[in-house]
Amino acid sequence: MKINTQDLLKAGVHFGHIARKWNPNMRPFIFMKKGGIHIIDLSKTISKLEDACNALKKTVKNGKKILLVGTKAQAKEKVFVYAKSINMPCITERWLGGLLTNFTTIRKSVKKMNNIEKMKKNGTFNTLSKKERLLIDRLYAKLYKNLGSISNMNQIPGGIFLVDPNKEKIALTEAKKLKIPVFAMVDTNTDPSNIQYPIPSNDDSSKSIDIILRFVSEAIKHSISREIKNSINKKL
């Protein structure tokens, strides 16, 4: 899927924030100021997006998962849909403190949730008393809301993708602490120096978020497909 300027323009990827709210470290990625709003240089967006996609392909090729994070209203549904399409974990609700830095404990909760699902499938759940079933259902609902979308994340992810690093500060801090590569959309009010793979882009528009996620997910999907083909060829 080729990245072109016209598609990015149509999606409004170039619209930044009000100039007075800018982060000076975004200077290299700003094309101009128009009507008091910073306009992002889309040639830089394309270059950085290509760098990010290439790095994502390598990460996935090595068998690692990418954790997609977007808890703001404009991003939630997009992140969930794209993550599901490429079988990657995601967080669209509140970030649980320690999700990465205390992963062992989080993983235990995920296993508990998965065990409840097994109980329901194999019929064990139906042998319990009404009170026990009610308590387990409540526990499951709570676990699923917070952890359902990362049930396939069996180890620390090989990378984390953030729609808005300013919104996902705890996730960013935890990833940096564990030296997990960070991929992120960076608007003109964001500090890109904290991000290994910054993608200069409008992180407030649902259309902008959608197109960036589309390119990112296509890159991951391409890498997964190639690995599956290579695996099949080795067996032949």
Describe every region a protein language model picked out.
Residues M1-K65, V69-N122, K130-R133, M153, ...:
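N-terminal cationic and glycine-rich segments that engage phosphates or anionic surfaces
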Residues I40, V69, L162-D164, M185, ...:
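Conserved beta-strand segments of the P-loop GTPase G domain that flank and frequently precede/overlap
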Residues A73, P165-N166, N202-D203:
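Short, surface-exposed acidic/glycine-rich loop or hinge patches that mediate macromolecular interfaces
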Residues I86-I195:
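Long, charge-patterned amphipathic alpha-helical coiled-coil/hairpin "stalk" segments used as oligomerization
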Residues A171-S225:
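Short glycine/threonine-rich loop/turn motifs
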